[in-house]
């Protein structure tokens, strides 16, 4: 209600100023001076008091009745107001750059081709213990990779060992067993079992089993001690297969010669008989 009264008072003040200007100018049809319109103050926190009404409805309501009270605020009206206030983002138009689309022509460049020999020599990892094998030649990439992986593996294994030793010391201190740290090495302590000092669950042997074991000792056995010479294999080894094949080849050659001779002799006899 206060805002409506303020707007009506501003409109009446503007009309009185216009009338005074017209009377001073006389019967002139044109206005020589523009009346400065006072700037309207922004209404803050109007959402809580009034419902936002679009321009078309405002014109109809102001023409019909100015004494109508505003409607109560609802959630639907709030959402509609914020939807109308959302600014539409401008769509970015495609600007052609002139570059070719897709993969560029030519051979694909690799990182190895970009590295120079000087950079490779400066940054190459050194393994001096391999000079006896390769000499002063540079190592291939595969060997460098395998040795680097081995170095990293050894480093992480050493870290694991240090971590184990640290936690072992702390646990022994909590158990008040600090003397064992001085006597035993940590590597030997690592593979130590719980039943070193004594069995966890001792098993008692029965009397029947003890009697059977004593009887077996007194009984005679058929086992005899034998010298080692009985277990030595004879020195006669079979001939190799290659020799067998050679003998077969020689035999086939001899048979072929005999067959040729017999065939020739048969032909010679037949010619004479004819």
Curated annotation (Swiss-Prot):
The keyword Methyltransferase does not apply. GO terms for molecular function: DNA binding; identical protein binding. The keyword Transcription applies. It comes from the Eukaryota. Residues 1-45, 84-111 are annotated as: Disordered. InterPro entries: TAF1D. GO terms for biological process: regulation of DNA-templated transcription. The modification Phosphoserine is found at residues 20, 132, 229. Keywords: DNA-binding, Nucleus, Phosphoprotein, Transcription, Transcription regulation. Residues 84-110 have a biased composition (Basic residues). It holds the Pfam family TAF1D. Residues 1-19 have a biased composition (Polar residues). One of its GO terms (cellular component) is RNA polymerase transcription factor SL1 complex. It is found in: Nucleus. Its main location: nucleus. Component of the transcription factor SL1/TIF-IB complex, composed of TBP and at least TAF1A, TAF1B, TAF1C and TAF1D. Interacts with UBTF. Component of the transcription factor SL1/TIF-IB complex, which is involved in the assembly of the PIC (preinitiation complex) during RNA polymerase I-dependent transcription. The rate of PIC formation probably is primarily dependent on the rate of association of SL1/TIF-IB with the rDNA promoter. SL1/TIF-IB is involved in stabilization of nucleolar transcription factor 1/UBTF on rDNA. Formation of SL1/TIF-IB excludes the association of TBP with TFIID subunits. PANTHER family: TATA BOX-BINDING PROTEIN ASSOCIATED FACTOR RNA POLYMERASE I SUBUNIT D, TATA BOX-BINDING PROTEIN-ASSOCIATED FACTOR RNA POLYMERASE I SUBUNIT D. This is TATA box-binding protein-associated factor RNA polymerase I subunit D. The gene is TAF1D.
């Amino acid at each position: 209600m206060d805002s409506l009264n303020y707007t009506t008072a501003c409109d009446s003040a503007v009309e009185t100023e216009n009338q005074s200007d017209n009377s001073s100018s006389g019967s002139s049809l044109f206005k020589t001076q523009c009346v400065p319109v006072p700037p309207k103050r922004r209404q803050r926190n109007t959402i809580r008091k009034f419902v936002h009404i679009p321009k078309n409805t405002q014109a109809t309501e102001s023409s019909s009745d100015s004494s109508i009270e505003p409607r109560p605020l609802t959630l639907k009206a709030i959402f509609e107001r914020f939807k109308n206030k959302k600014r539409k983002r401008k769509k970015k138009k495609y600007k052609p750059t002139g570059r070719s689309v897709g993969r560029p022509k030519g051979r694909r460049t690799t990182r190895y081709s970009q590295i120079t020999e000087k950079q490779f020599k400066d940054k190459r990892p050194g393994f001096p213990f391999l000079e006896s094998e390769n000499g002063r030649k540079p190592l291939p990439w595969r060997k460098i990779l395998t040795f680097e992986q081995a170095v990293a593996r050894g480093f992480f294994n050493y870290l694991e060992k240090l971590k184990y030793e640290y936690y072992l010391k702390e646990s022994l201190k909590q158990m008040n067993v600090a003397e064992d740290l001085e006597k035993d090495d940590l590597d030997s302590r690592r593979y130590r079992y719980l039943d070193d000092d004594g069995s966890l669950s001792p098993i008692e042997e029965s009397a029947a089993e003890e009697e059977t074991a004593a009887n077996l000792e007194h009984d005679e056995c058929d086992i005899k001690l034998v010298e080692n010479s009985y277990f030595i294999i004879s020195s006669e080894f079979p001939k190799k297969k290659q020799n067998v094949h050679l003998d077969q080849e020689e035999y086939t050659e001899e048979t072929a010669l005999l067959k040729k001779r017999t065939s020739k002799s048969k032909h010679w006899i037949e010619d004479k008989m004819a």
